[in-house]
Amino acid sequence: MECQRCSASARNPATVESRKEKFCDECFIKFVSTKQRKQMMKDEYFRNLFKVIYPFEKEGSVSKILLPLSLSDSGSLVMLDIVHDLLLEQTKQHNNRTGFTVDVLTVFTEENVSVIKERMESLINEKMSQLNKISNIFNVHFIDVNEFFNNASEVSTFIIDNENFEIFSKSKSVDDSNILTLKEILGKYCLNSSSRSDLISIIKTQLIKHFAYENGYNAIMWGHSMTKLSEVIISLVVKGKGSQIATFLDSESFDTLNNKPCKYKNLYPMKDLLSVEIESFLQIRNLAQFLINVEETNVKPNCLIARKSLPSLGQQKLVKNMTINEITNKYFQDIQNDYSNIISTVLRTADKLTQPKSSMAKPSQCQICQSKIYTNPSNWLNRITVTSPYPVETTEEKYLFKQWQDSKLGQSHTHYVELLNEIKQGASNSLDVEDSDVKLCYGCLILLNTSIKDKNLVWPKVDTMDITANATNKNKELSQILDQFEINSDGEE
């Protein structure tokens, strides 16, 4: 088989087959790179961010771009590789000048910190050092996921009244004696893997957005493929967060954080690419070596003709053990080679959505996920739900009720009622308007009501956070990054 994009006089052997077209390695790399660069130049705002602007002395001629890099995600790594090639081209064409600089941000946990250090050192040496010898184009930052809790001066305890779904909260100051950790939150409050996955995703996204807000970036480049975006869209619908889809995909408006306008826009440069195409690019460019899950990456579906791989049956989870995100991921991974039009249809349809009209008296954002709230979910749930129990009457019912009270479930409910009464009493005595007017989006309310132990959750107050306080490397040479990398975990350097 020959490449269909090479010139007729010199066709190379085809190595990739995607969208019913055959490519050689070189043509496929160009195909993927062109798709990404097209998105980076999608409108005037982004064109001005990424192109080289003359004169160089003009204020704002060099844009600041934040690129969140996950070393377990092929999309963000491929995106970084293509951005690196673009910057290299600009230095050659414009006398060592570039139109933008890139700050790479990696969020790490205690479990993967050592391997992240190792992979980042290799990535820096191979992909970033060359450009930084010319100019300070790349900066690398690391944030411990626990900084989400460490850098908040106040936390709120949210609890749901199961009689009317009203949300109450109690705020308290944080000091060294009561600092929370991700491990504690997930272990103490989450009842299933879906709730753990949701909270981890929210925390990482908020860390990245806070970092962008506090450091004045012009754009955040997310490495989501068309497949990944479709997965997120369906997951949002399933979780009761469908109203967030339009805001999530919005690349035209500036973002908001805690009802404050930000100076950056969100961009998805990989949104025209399927995940199998990204995995194929990763293999061709030999980028898998930089990921922390190399073995898992090597068996992911791709569109390479000679090296197609599928996960073995022994590695597949049972559906009942999967999170919502994993179920949607499996569905789209299974269909993308043969029915990629379904994926593109999901994304095209979602792109046409607009934000719902708000019925709120004033703009409000969810205190957990920071999404916009358009209607009060507590009122709606209270109207459609019967929550009053049938009274205990017979001797048998009283006996069974007593048994339930003595069980772990009954004791847990007793603890919930005591905590609810305590927080409600505190809320009635509080003069804090925010505490008396707490709002959660429908999705987070359902999460709290069904997947969080005792229907209560301790969460940092967003307006008291300072993410940059402990982010490593602020304008340091790349050669010094790893030496200055502070690990916020016991037993690690």
Swiss-Prot record:
GO CC annotations, alphabetized: cytosol
UniProt subcellular location: Cytoplasm
InterPro entries with a match to the protein in the record: CTU2, Rossmann-like_a/b/a_fold
GO molecular function: nucleotidyltransferase activity; sulfurtransferase activity; tRNA binding
Pathway note: tRNA modification; 5-methoxycarbonylmethyl-2-thiouridine-tRNA biosynthesis
Pfam families xrefs: CTU2 (PF10288)
Residues where Phosphoserine is found: 489
Gene Ontology terms: biological process: protein urmylation; tRNA thio-modification; tRNA wobble position uridine thiolation; tRNA wobble uridine modification
Record's keyword terms, sorted: Cytoplasm, Phosphoprotein, tRNA processing
Function: Plays a central role in 2-thiolation of mcm(5)S(2)U at tRNA wobble positions of tRNA(Lys), tRNA(Glu) and tRNA(Gln). May act by forming a heterodimer with NCS6 that ligates sulfur from thiocarboxylated URM1 onto the uridine of tRNAs at wobble position. Prior mcm(5) tRNA modification by the elongator complex is required for 2-thiolation. May also be involved in protein urmylation.
Family: Belongs to the CTU2/NCS2 family.
Stored PANTHER family: CYTOPLASMIC TRNA 2-THIOLATION PROTEIN 2
Subunit structure: Interacts with NCS6 and URM1. May act by forming a heterodimer with NCS6.
Protein known as: Cytoplasmic tRNA 2-thiolation protein 2
Phylogenetic lineage: Eukaryota, Fungi, Dikarya, Ascomycota, Saccharomycotina
Gene name of this polypeptide: NCS2
